[in-house]
Amino acid sequence: MNFQQSAIPPFSFLLSFTQGFLLGQLSVVLLIGAFIKFFIFGEAPPPPSRGLSHRASTHRRSNSIYTISTNEAGSRSLREKPSTSNVLRPVPSSSTNTRSILRKTYYGAIPTNPSKHGRHRVHHSSHQPESLDWFNVLIAQTIAQYRQTAYLLKDEPTSSILSSLTAALNNPEKKPSFIDKITVTDISLGEEFPIFSNCRIIAVDDPNSDGGRLQALMDVDLSDDNLSIGIETSLLLNYPKPGSAILPVALSISVVRFSGTLCISLVPASTPPLHTPSPSPAPQTADGARTQSQPENNSSNPNQQSADASGAPPKTSPKSNVAFSFLPDYRLDLSVRSLIGSRSRLQDVPKVAQLVEARVHAWFEERVVEPRVQVVGLPDLWPRMGRTGVRTGEDSETGSNAASRSAISADLGSSLRDDLDQGPDGLRFRGPLGARPQFDSVSRSSSFNVETGGFHGHPMTREDSRGAISDDFHMPGSLPDGAVGN
């Protein structure tokens, strides 16, 4: 009995080992088969598309209440005739606030949260900062064009940068009486370009706009440049009589390095203008009163009424603006060299350098350092024929332009042939004698007009009822001038 009990465990041990071995082999076979089926013979996933369809499938936009109401309004507009005062559909504030803009542009910005003291904190976006390499190239091209234009206009008496700086430095309303006329002796616009980097979008609280406003912050750095200006003047001692003593002074100011954080934001047209405190209020003059009353008088100006009738926007219409400024933690390093006196000259006086640097910093902070901002109006980007230009050169003739021009010439040619077949009231072709068709004398006199001494410059002319030749080009079937004017 004891022998049987001792013989059972080896049999059960062998049976469990066999089952485990078979189970392990089966699992290995299944893994190998799954690997061969799904990883070797499986179809590769399609490459990610960069088109708009993939972007639309990745970022699902939920249908808002405004979309539903817009569709309903569109269906109602087919049945009901809208009034003339309700043609432009209103834009809800929910589609123009900060959160809606960030959601529709897929920019992950963190909204502002109230702090313990009741103020709103400014949170940076979770979006990665941008390098702005493309922006640096555009800014560099713009600055290079300004430098080249300033050099080309150096000899102009009114448009040169020298005359502008001289007039600004010698402004009688700002220049003290103890300083003589300031003469600009040297101007250097530099050779390097500012480098912008680390651009990020933040949401700040603004009581004038719904949901706050967006602000772009970017770091700017300008170093190792020779941006400088040199001036000469004289200090006048007007006691006991004017011009009792004269002390010549020569200064040279150079920008060694500038770095800071630039803030750019958009000011909508409906927002009231930003109030920028000035250190000294401007005096009320008769010219200023006349300037303030000028817009009222312009309302009765016939030129302005004709401009409004032609479709151009009025000059008094509100415009969107761009506000930019620098944070107070900027860095502006200057190099000031001075030369005082005529005989025994004092060179590079430290006190003069401190005074000049303090004045330059004060001038800069009074204009573009927070909380003061510079507001610049955005230009009118509506396409107009008055601003239309054509690139010169043979390489600018692209295939699309050539195709469009050939299509236009083909249409004109077909219309000319139709008009010539209709009768003598169509367009006349002026060409050399060898190009004349064999017409009779009547048709020849009405269709061809050859001038002695050379042919007319315009390829097409029109002969009126009196037999005179006019250079005006009129398309067949067009309205007369009187009908167009009415």
From Swiss-Prot:
The SMP-LTD domain is a barrel-like domain that can bind various types of glycerophospholipids in its interior and mediate their transfer between two adjacent bilayers. Keywords: Endoplasmic reticulum, Lipid transport, Lipid-binding, Membrane, Transmembrane, Transmembrane helix, Transport. One of its GO terms (molecular function) is lipid binding. Residues 271-282 have a biased composition (Pro residues). It is a single-pass type I membrane protein. Belongs to the MMM1 family. Residues 460-474 have a biased composition (Basic and acidic residues). Residues 42-486 are cytoplasmic. Component of the ERMES/MDM complex, which serves as a molecular tether to connect the endoplasmic reticulum (ER) and mitochondria. Components of this complex are involved in the control of mitochondrial shape and protein biogenesis, and function in nonvesicular lipid trafficking between the ER and mitochondria. The mdm12-mmm1 subcomplex functions in the major beta-barrel assembly pathway that is responsible for biogenesis of all outer membrane beta-barrel proteins, and acts in a late step after the SAM complex. One of its GO terms (biological process) is mitochondrion-endoplasmic reticulum membrane tethering. CDD domains: SMP_Mmm1. InterPro entries: Mmm1, MMM1_dom, SMP_LBD. GO terms for cellular component: endoplasmic reticulum membrane; ERMES complex. Residues 83-96, 398-407, 440-450 have a biased composition (Polar residues). Residues 1-20 are lumenal. It is found in: Endoplasmic reticulum membrane. Residues 70-96, 271-320, 387-486 are annotated as: Disordered. The chain crosses the membrane at residues 21-41. Residues 128-379 form the SMP-LTD domain. The lineage of its organism: Eukaryota, Fungi, Dikarya, Ascomycota, Pezizomycotina. Homodimer. Component of the ER-mitochondria encounter structure (ERMES) or MDM complex, composed of mmm1, mdm10, mdm12 and mdm34. A mmm1 homodimer associates with one molecule of mdm12 on each side in a pairwise head-to-tail manner, and the SMP-LTD domains of mmm1 and mdm12 generate a continuous hydrophobic tunnel for phospholipid trafficking. This is Maintenance of mitochondrial morphology protein 1. Residues 292-306 have a biased composition (Low complexity).
